Amino acid sequence: MAREFSLEKTRNIGIMAHVDAGKTTTTERILYYTGKIHKIGETHEGASQMDWMEQEQERGITITSAATTAQWNNHRVNIIDTPGHVDFTIEVQRSLRVLDGAVTVLDSQSGVEPQTETVWRQATEYGVPRIVFANKMDKIGADFLYSVSTLHDRLQANAHPIQLPIGSEDDFRGIIDLIKMKAEIYTNDLGTDILEEDIPAEYLDQAQEYREKLIEAVAETDEELMMKYLEGEEITNEELKAGIRKATINVEFFPVLCGSAFKNKGVQLMLDAVIDYLPSPLDIPAIKGINPDTDAEETRPASDEEPFAALAFKIMTDPFVGRLTFFRVYSGVLQSGSYVLNTSKGKRERIGRILQMHANSRQEIDTVYSGDIAAAVGLKDTTTGDSLTDEKAKIILESINVPEPVIQLMVEPKSKADQDKMGIALQKLAEEDPTFRVETNVETGETVISGMGELHLDVLVDRMRREFKVEANVGAPQVSYRETFRASTQARGFFKRQSGGKGQFGDVWIEFTPNEEGKGFEFENAIVGGVVPREFIPAVEKGLVESMANGVLAGYPMVDVKAKLYDGSYHDVDSSETAFKIAASLSLKEAAKSAQPAILEPMMLVTITVPEENLGDVMGHVTARRGRVDGMEAHGNSQIVRAYVPLAEMFGYATVLRSASQGRGTFMMVFDHYEDVPKSVQEEIIKKNKGED
């Protein structure tokens, strides 16, 4: 089958936002206007097309990124709807990794909210161009210009309106296009009848002022436009649009649009902006990767003529076709039935069928081309972040950063029959979601699951029950602590056993130093003269890695430590890998005596919104929970408090806040960083873990 849409006419976009900003409804409207669905599904009725999991429809939130393809103005738009809840950050991250552009949806009443900051930061990290859609203009308290100001104040974004609303709240009836300088007036509730008129007289001054600001902001990103602007020459609409497109693609400028997806206003104009200002696969730099045979960096430009290269960004279990692997094709062409190489795992995979997804319905296709997003059936070894390439032109593309889980729960099957089913279910769920970890406590045999938050684990336990029919008892949530060293030290690990049978001999000197936060464990071999033979070096590193899985203070994993093996000795006959592994672990234990070991706890960035009169209560809550206030701002009659609070102190806070504010207060929290626990708390944790009361 020949290519239907050229690369220039392809857009791969994500829709991202804070929970409840109206993201899924916006995607629904896009599908409605592009002819994909005939009836609009409302999220609050539990009938949305993109939210296809049972739980999503019940909870009215989006959990998995559904991928769908639509057509607009002779362009193909592949859309990924991402979750806005902080517990599902990995879904946002893996989507951003394979997108070329994104639409950030704001709630016009609240502007930038905590999770907006998180997804914005992630999009900046991946260099994703964005346009902003200020949604819910029909809502009480909607304020477009306030929303724009929050983009400047909270995100330091060079964001400027390319539209202005006509009216707001119940009176929201149209949109001013600042490029054409025309007004779009909506005459019905389906948003299909739109009249283009001159700008109403009472809005003309404001429109001229904001067009001037827009021209100035765009001119600052382009030398030619700047010269014309300074010389007082007129900048044409075409030049202005070209300037906005160039600056947006270079991530120097963010156009802001307005509308109400629920009331069907502004969505078509937003689709026009996706085509006009967001990049095609040809507009962004060619993807880079490493050739596994030569270790040299190579690029893969977006072209059907190049060798095939794709990135798997999501695994999903479909009730009808089994395991689905979603992938983005960066270069080349792939046909169903062909073989590819998974360069991340070094394994050959056969592509059974290729499906193009529309939320949860699917269409089988024979061929995918560069720039496409599709799902494959039949891949056995491929997981999130793996590269799939032509067998003759290997390349490993940059993978996806997976955040560490911060919360854990104990789960146990209710009956013996559930035992095996639970193992299979947890394994499948962990394949789909890299931030979900499953471990078995060797001593107690208990199964511990870890994830990004209470809702995250809730949803997974719920899915285990619904999809895999496993009934399980769930323990109280526990915090995922970490351990580290705060001082440098040198320590010897000496292991010798020479009585009866084969002897054992291992002797190492290791220097331990604290590593930068987030850098993890780093091992350096500084042995000279072969005092520890080369074949035993990996055993020393392995011995340290295994010992660090159970830290020296309370058995939590150790992080951010550098270990330099610089001296030691061996025995010609008795030395073995096992002996050096044990010696390395003894060296770590010895180091703990002088390296100031510390326990680290996850600190959450908590944003609490309460009525003015409850501000004092909230400040008290933060202090009582070992937190520190980072900032406050007034918004209408509410106060917004930002604070850093240990996760351990936040369990059950929803109930406390609800009763203190008579149900009017809300809070959001997102993991921010790890920090040393105070000495008194550390002693309690150690006691508890040693089984003392």
Swiss-Prot record:
Gene Ontology MF terms in the entry: GTP binding; GTPase activity; translation elongation factor activity
GO biological process assignments: ribosome disassembly
InterPro entries membership: EF-G-like_DII, EFG_II, EFG_III, EFG_III/V, EFG_IV, EFG_V, EFG_V-like, G_TR_CS
Gene Ontology CC: cytoplasm
Superkingdom of this protein's organism: Bacteria
Annotated positions binding GTP: 17-24, 81-85, 135-138
Keyword set, alphabetical order: Cytoplasm, Elongation factor, GTP-binding, Nucleotide-binding, Protein biosynthesis
Major subcellular site: cytoplasm
Entry's localization field: Cytoplasm
One Pfam assignment: EFG_IV
Domain tr-type G: residue ranges: 8-282
Database matches in SMART domains: EFG_C, EFG_IV
Function: Catalyzes the GTP-dependent ribosomal translocation step during translation elongation. During this step, the ribosome changes from the pre-translocational (PRE) to the post-translocational (POST) state as the newly formed A-site-bound peptidyl-tRNA and P-site-bound deacylated tRNA move to the P and E sites, respectively. Catalyzes the coordinated movement of the two tRNA molecules, the mRNA and conformational changes in the ribosome.
Similarity annotation: Belongs to the TRAFAC class translation factor GTPase superfamily. Classic translation factor GTPase family. EF-G/EF-2 subfamily.
Protein name, as recorded: Elongation factor G
Biological source species: Streptococcus pneumoniae (strain JJA)
Source species taxonomy: Bacteria, Bacillati, Bacillota, Bacilli, Lactobacillales
Gene: fusA
